[in-house]
Regions:
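Active-site nucleophile and cofactor-binding loops and adjacent substrate-binding regions
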Residues: 97-105, 120-121, 148, 224, ...
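Glycine-rich phosphate-binding loop of actin/hexokinase-like ATP-binding domains
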Residues: 114-165
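Short beta-strand-loop/turn "lid" adjacent to the catalytic site in phosphate-handling enzymes
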Residues: 36-37, 53-99, 111
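Glycine-rich beta-strand-to-loop/alpha-helix junction loops that act as flexible
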Residues: 72-77, 121-124, 243-253
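Glycine/charged-rich beta-loop-alpha catalytic/anionic-binding loops adjacent to active sites
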Residues: 89-92, 135-142, 258-264
Length: 290
């Protein structure tokens, strides 16, 4: 018998877990490093378990309570069939485990289980339309081939433009100076770093762009304008596809939402963790890969 419901929201940078009892009382929360399935199933599995374990400890529950937990996993890249099935073959100690995408978890939370649409712009980006009982993914195919308007994309563009500033192709920029100082003003160091960098590594530079833009840096301001244009393109396309209510989520999305107000965005009712818990508890919801 399931006594506890666990929601997990996992993206490229962080994995968060929340536990509630059958009455809906919040018992505990935990977090770990990112659990984007495309970056490695074993790695994501370990981070998911670590986040849930931290939440269990926060709740003061014994380890054997795991056998009475129903878990809803809302993880980045779960929309990819091979990642989805591989994750569900991993061993879990829980009574039940259900898996969906981080986008659908966020959508369920944003609209409290009702239909709607969301555009997440965090480390990565993904749009999802939940309409007439069906799910439609918009973008979100992974960095760098997709994920426009994301923190990873913004970080990549900042590095690209900073290298041009360093070479004298573009005018001087305080953002470019800070970035190049980080790499010891050595272009070869940038190339070596990029050979092994993951989306979260690029995304760590996104706050630097916001900081520089607030100080009036022209390059940073142009990069934020570019990011807004990318998100605007996605929002416009989703509207054309039938999305009449869209919540803009994620660290990048929420910071840029005031500049995209003409799309009549709606505020989320709940967060992605509540959406993941709702997914765990509800049978009649779309499955990514039946």
């Amino acid at each position: 018998m399931i006594e506890f419901w666990v929601g997990v929201d996992g993206g490229g940078t962080h994995t968060r877990a929340r536990i509630r009892n059958n009455a809906g009382k919040l018992l505990g929360e935990g977090r770990a490093a990112g659990s984007n399935l495309e970056l490695g199933i074993a790695l994501a599995h370990g981070h998911v378990l670590a986040a849930i374990d931290q939440a269990r400890i926060d709740a003061g529950l014994p380890r054997e309570s795991e056998q009475r937990m129903g878990v809803g996993l809302a993880l980045a890249s779960a929309e990819l069939a091979d990642c989805y099935h591989a994750m569900l073959t991993m061993p879990f100690p829980f009574a039940r485990v259900k898996l969906t995408s981080d986008a659908f978890g966020a959508c369920l939370g944003a609209f409290d289980g009702q239909e709607g649409a969301i555009l997440i712009a965090g480390t990565g980006s993904a749009g999802l339309i939940y309409r007439e009982g069906r799910l439609r993914t918009c973008s979100g195919r992974g960095f760098p081939v997709s994920d426009l308007g994301s923190g990873a994309w913004l970080g990549l563009r900042a590095i690209q433009q900073s290298l041009l500033c360093h070479d004298g192709i573009l005018p001087p920029s305080t953002l470019a100076v800070r970035l190049m100082d980080h790499f010891k003003r050595d272009q070869a160091e940038v190339v070596r770093w990029a050979a092994h960098a993951i989306p979260a590594d690029y995304g760590r530079f996104a706050p630097w762009v916001f900081d520089a833009a607030s100080d009036g840096d022209e390059l940073a301001t142009a990069l934020l304008d570019e990011t807004c244009a990318q998100l605007g393109m996605l929002l416009e396309g989703m509207t054309q596809l039938g999305a009449d209510r869209i919540a803009l989520l994620g660290g990048i999305g929420t910071r840029l939402a005031p500049r995209l107000g003409h799309f009549h965005l709606v505020a989320p009712k709940r967060d992605a963790l509540e959406g993941a818990i709702l997914f765990a508890r509800t049978e009649a919801l779309p499955c990514l890969h039946p």
